[in-house]
């Protein structure tokens, strides 16, 4: 987050403002936007955490793509509110829900997705890691399980930081080892 903030101010000394020239904008992924949002909230004393999971942009539950969001604690409602800081909702009617209060049924947290696949409750192919390889199912969910686990510990690791067996060898893990 400090490096992103420094670059934002380097590109435009006014910092966080709207309607910037394209040359003054910082291109980031949903992960970067989530980390930056959490940093800003925490600096202002607002409880916030990053979460890595899968979102249903199609409205039918058939495909959920990998995505990072934030959860901001709402003291009045006594709940975590799911917020997407990455700005994909410029036309909220297109999605049918607000980026500032994403319904829980639209975002699948990695741990629940993992458990649902393993129990046979859902077809794992619907959870897709958008890596140009079509990675889905348990492999995609396991990748995001590690990312979300670290995010919950305030240690948001980069996409490629994961155990070696996740890259090659997941199919070699026995059912006993999974248990």
Residue ranges and their predicted role:
Residues 1-24, 36:
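Secondary-structure boundary elements
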Residues 23-52, 70:
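Cysteine-centered nucleophilic/redox motifs
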Residues 1, 10, 53-68, 72-179:
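His-Asp-centered catalytic microenvironments across diverse enzyme cores
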């Amino acid at each position: 987050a400090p490096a992103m903030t420094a670059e934002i101010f380097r590109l435009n000394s006014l910092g966080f403002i709207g309607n910037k020239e394209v040359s003054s904008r910082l291109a980031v992924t949903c992960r970067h936007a989530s980390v930056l949002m959490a940093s800003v909230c925490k600096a202002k004393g607002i409880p916030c955490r990053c979460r890595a999971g899968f979102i249903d942009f199609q409205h039918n539950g058939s495909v959920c793509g990998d995505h990072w969001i934030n959860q901001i604690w709402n003291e009045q409602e006594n709940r975590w509110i799911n917020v997407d800081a990455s700005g994909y909702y410029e036309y909220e009617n297109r999605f049918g829900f607000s980026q500032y209060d994403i319904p829980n049924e639209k975002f699948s947290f990695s741990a629940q997705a993992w458990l649902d696949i393993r129990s046979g409750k859902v077809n794992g192919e619907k959870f897709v890691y958008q890596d140009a390889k079509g990675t889905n199912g348990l492999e995609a969910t396991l990748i995001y399980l590690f990312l979300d686990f670290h995010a919950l510990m305030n240690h948001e690791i980069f996409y490629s930081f994961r155990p070696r067996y996740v890259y090659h060898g997941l199919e070699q893990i026995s059912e006993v080892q999974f248990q």
